[in-house]
Amino acid sequence: MAGSSRRFTDAGYELPKYMLDAHGKSLFRHSVESFSAYFDRELFLFIAREIGATAEFLETELRTLGVKEHQVVMLDAPTSGQAETVVRGLEGAARQAGTDADQPLTIFNIDTFRPSFRYPDLFELGAVDGYLETFIGSGANWSNVVPAEGNEHRVVKTAEKQQISEYCCTGLYYFRSSQRFRALFDAEVKALGASGAETYVAPMYNRLIAHGGDIRYSVIEPKDVIFCGVPAEYEAFLAVEPTS
């Protein structure tokens, strides 16, 4: 929610995309409801910019949803990409809480829906350094993972917007350590130098892998994830009759 929703603005939409309605609910609510199984046991962090009274919108939606523990961090400037957005959000959350405790980190996009999400049971979540959720697909617009030979749902390489395998990422990323994520980001920024390149999350796993990190992946059916990141996807979602 720290982006500008430019493609939606260019298409004539006046509200930020996460405020847009679909089947009687905002896209924000559709996305966050994906994780309703964890509303009473995990801390949720929402990172946004103050566009169109976003802070008030978030608090109203979160009360309606019943998310037990949450923090909202409002950024005052655009970032270089999703990875920096997460880091700035973690820093803001630490300032709010008065502590910088290390904890597991799950990252997800507010314009994507994963109805009835559950963490995978293919491996022990707390024992791996990270995992990426994938589906079988194609196209150079996705992040990808390359599985290890012999599989075991182990990852040997990740890439952003390069078709290096059929395993396309849904945008759900898990790291066992939030502090390690921040260190990985610092290393990524140093490597990018003054190029001004966008900072993506998926390629950061390669640094963990290079140092012996245990990175896994899960696979879901394409029908189990819904994307609304561009106007055409949103309009396609509007055209689908709700199932309940």
Regions found by a protein language model. Name each.
Residues 1-2, 47-48, 109, 134:
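Short beta-strand/turn micro-motifs composed of small residues
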Residues 1-13:
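N-terminal nucleotide-binding beta1-loop-alpha1 segment
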Residues 7-9, 20-21, 25-103:
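Conserved N-terminal catalytic core of the sugar/cofactor nucleotidyltransferase
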Residues 19, 144-148, 217:
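A structural signal for short hydrophobic beta-strand segments in well-ordered beta-sheet cores
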Residues 52, 111-114:
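A short, conserved beta-strand element in the Rossmann-like catalytic core
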Residues 104-108:
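Short aromatic-hydrophobic micro-motifs that form the base-stacking/packing surface
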Residues 113-195:
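Conserved core of the sugar-phosphate nucleotidyltransferase
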Residues 168-244:
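Conserved alpha/beta core of the MobA/IspD/sugar-nucleotide pyrophosphorylase nucleotidyltransferase superfamily
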